[in-house]
Amino acid sequence: MMAKQVPSVSVSYARNGNSTTSNELGMRAMQERAYEKRGEQYLLIKSPPASGKSRALMFIALDKLHNQGLRQAIVVVPEKSIGASFNDEPLSDFGFWADWSVLPKWNLCNSPGTDGGKVKSVTAFLESGDRVLVCTH
């Protein structure tokens, strides 16, 4: 049985300022390359810290929710502090066709509580009609 390869986007920078320039949708070069792969079921994004991985995921998740038929998106981050990167973001102010929005009750990185309570919250989210949940793994 052959192992299935997971598409990935790796980025290295020449330090010439191009990585901070945005396109007409408000995406930097790495985010644009990741967005080009948005139809993949699995996507691994390897990029330096503060390069825009969180925002790239917002672009991709919004496309999956609005254009690819996904009902809900669960963003899973390795630590609570990274979850703050997924608060509401007015992406349309920069040219994208939608804004990123997470109801406060569904950003479990910002809410106190035990893991048992968070498991109940995930279950409640899955049973709800809401679109996005952010939590730690």
Ranges and model annotations:
Residues 42, 71-72, 102-107:
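Residues that mark the start of a beta-strand
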Residues 81-116:
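Conserved helix-turn-beta segment of the N-terminal RecA-like "Helicase ATP-binding" lobe
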